[in-house]
């Protein structure tokens, strides 16, 4: 049993969690769905240590290096059910996983059928991911027909100081995502926010590295207990930046020692996450390369912090990459630095990444 479950003050936690759900109901955030569609809760609870040990890095990767998206914002129906030709095209890419976006979702049954078709064609071990952080970045729960609770932004959860609440949110999300066939959640955000006008906004648990670490650890334990892998992000931390990496490259003008104290602690707490995501940030006092292409950053993760999660990049269709590098160069640089997976939501088939 996870240690902090033994230290819960039962009535207080119950009241606090009940208050959260009451607030969500009043705000209309809990989706109106047909729960009869879902099977009863008959899947086994998963022992986290046994589960993560059994599903090891080599079994996940098997020589595959790319996580890709199947996108069509202008015509969502085109990516809510896939033709054999499209599936064959994806199979030629041989991705380790598929990340789904809002246009891939119509309702719960369609989503489950889409994922089952992907697995039939690409293999049952293909990873299926979504960004479900809570708050603004909630690709699944923003569709009320999917049966995923639309939790508030993690900043509000962090303010409660209640890491058992973070555990419960992770647990519920894990159960609901797994019912759909999703087995990876690109969360939690482990960045400690300390820069003025930081673009992360309410996505992070707050500014205290230690408190964020407790929240991150709890969320990861909760979601992975239900058989959904967590992705702790965005190492080395975006909380000290002032540029949104969706738009351009961010800068962290701090020393390694400063970041060890202010940025890295939450990632140490989150080391049980199956994946760790690198942000598109330049840290000139550590490396001349962008973090998502940097061997120096990989070495810090592996050798200084002793984190052995699978290392993946943030999305390579973001402004930080496309405005500054060719995708072919960025991908080769990342893989040569020791990064395990490159995330490419759009545009993969246009690339030539062969050596």
Question: Can you name each region flagged by the protein language model?
Answer:
Residues 7, 12-29:
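Classical Sec-dependent N-terminal signal peptides that target proteins to the secretory pathway
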Residues 30-128, 132-144:
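N-terminal hydrophobic targeting/anchoring segments and the immediately downstream early-domain regions
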Residues 64-70, 96-100, 128-132, 184-188, ...:
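Hydrophobic faces of well-ordered beta-strands that scaffold small-molecule active sites
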Residues 77-78, 82, 107-121, 126, ...:
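Second-shell residues forming the walls of enzyme active-site clefts
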Residues 106-111, 158-172, 210-214, 260:
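Glycine-rich anion/phosphate-binding loops
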Residues 121-149, 169-192, 212, 220-236:
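Glycine-rich, aromatic-flanked loop segments that form ligand/cofactor-binding clefts
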Residues 146-161, 206:
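A charged helix-plus-loop insertion that forms the helical arch/lid used to bind
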């Amino acid at each position: 049993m996870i240690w902090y479950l033994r230290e819960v003050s039962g009535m207080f936690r119950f009241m606090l969690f009940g208050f959260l759900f009451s607030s969500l109901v009043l705000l209309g955030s809990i989706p109106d769905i047909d729960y009869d569609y879902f099977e009863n809760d008959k899947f086994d609870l998963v022992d986290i240590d046994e589960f993560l040990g059994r599903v090891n890095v080599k079994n996940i990767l098997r020589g595959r290096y790319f996580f890709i998206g199947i996108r069509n914002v202008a015509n969502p129906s085109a990516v809510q059910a896939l033709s054999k030709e499209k599936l064959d095209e994806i199979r030629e890419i041989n991705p380790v996983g598929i990340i789904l976006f809002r246009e891939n979702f119509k309702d719960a049954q369609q989503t489950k059928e889409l994922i089952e078709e992907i697995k039939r064609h690409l293999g049952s071990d293909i990873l299926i991911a979504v960004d479900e952080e809570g708050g603004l970045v909630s690709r699944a729960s923003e569709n009320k027909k999917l049966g995923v609770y639309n939790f508030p932004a993690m900043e509000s959860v962090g303010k409660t100081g209640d890491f058992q609440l973070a555990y419960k949110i992770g647990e519920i999300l894990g159960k609901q995502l797994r019912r759909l066939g999703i087995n990876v959640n690109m969360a939690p955000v482990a960045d400690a926010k300390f820069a003025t006008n930081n673009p992360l906004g309410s996505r992070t648990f707050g500014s205290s590295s230690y408190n964020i670490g407790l929240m991150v650890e709890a969320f990861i334990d909760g979601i992975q207990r239900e058989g959904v892998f967590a992705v702790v992000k965005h190492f080395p931390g975006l909380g000290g930046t002032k540029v949104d990496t969706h738009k351009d490259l961010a800068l962290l003008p701090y020393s390694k020692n400063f970041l060890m104290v202010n940025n890295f602690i939450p990632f140490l707490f989150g080391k049980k996450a199956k994946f760790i995501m690198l942000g598109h940030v330049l840290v000139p006092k550590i490396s001349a390369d962008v973090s998502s292409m940097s061997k120096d950053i990989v070495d810090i993760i592996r050798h200084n912090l002793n984190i052995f999660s699978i290392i993946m990049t943030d999305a390579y269709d973001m402004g930080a990459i496309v405005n500054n590098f060719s995708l072919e160069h960025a991908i080769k640089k990342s893989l040569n630095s020791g990064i395990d997976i490159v995330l490419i939501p759009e545009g993969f088939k246009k690339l030539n990444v062969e050596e």
